[in-house]
Amino acid sequence: SYSSTPGAEAPEKNEKRVKQYAMMQKIQKFGGAMFTPVLLFAFAGIVVGVGTLFTTEAIMGDLAKPDSLFYQCWNVILQGGWTVFNQLPLLFAVALPIGMAKKQNARCCMEALVLYLTFHYFLSTMLSQWGTAFGVDFSAEVGGTSGLAMIANIKTLDMGMIGALAISGIVIWLHNKLYDTELPDWLGSFNGSTFVFMVGFFVMIPVALISALVWPKVQLGMLAFQGFVKGAGALGIWIFILLERLLIPFGLHHILYSPFYYDNAVVPGGLYAYWATRLPEIAASTASLKSLVPEAGFTATGFSGMVPLSILPAQ
């Protein structure tokens, strides 16, 4: 009996390890798929940086006055550069199926786009009619602390990257389950993506209702977290960088920093977009970067490889 016990436990341990490995692979795959839109930041960031430089009067002088042809031409280019930053949730919704769909990835991207917009049309209409019941002032201006945003010209709740990934994840699950469903011949035109859209259309109604009930409370929590992070100063940055370094060996660091960089965890719209919008003010000011954009310290994760974590809070 003594010798049989290890043999009986070994398959269970191996099975547990296989499941853990499979789960880790899925999480890493999710992190990689989530990172896809970020690849566009390299070029878009250069365009925004150069465009901001040439449209900042404090740097270019009279050449960058708003009524000059030089300014107006560069402003056209600058506004085009904002595409990635302004439509980031939409990009996350479309990009996730590229790495997560098990079949017909391109069709799944289309389904995710259409159902993501459908979700926001449902949510927008619910809030416009019953906003007070959900604790949302839908008449407020978009941005600031209103909790509202414009997604593809739809006034809706600002659910940022988290909302986009959640809706896209639901669509991916529906796509993987339903895409190959064989309908009767007389319903043949509803096969494939059309069937996924049909089912997803009705799924989005309760999802929108739940979002209207829950997300305003989540936003209050995020505002409180933003206040805590800003108040923590260097200690908050140290904790963030420490966690990021600990997660790198597991390939999970994208999941930690994405809400900071691309979502509303610290500032509305994410740190990168926030930084880009503040560039003219920063360029025209003689104040220290720390006083102008204290939140930018969270983007200094790359310095942790050169500077010991033990001394970062002292900076």
Which role fits each region the language model picked out?
Residues S1-P184, F195-Q315:
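Pore-lining transmembrane helices
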Residues N191-S193:
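Juxtamembrane/start-of-transmembrane alpha-helix segments at the extracytoplasmic/lumenal side
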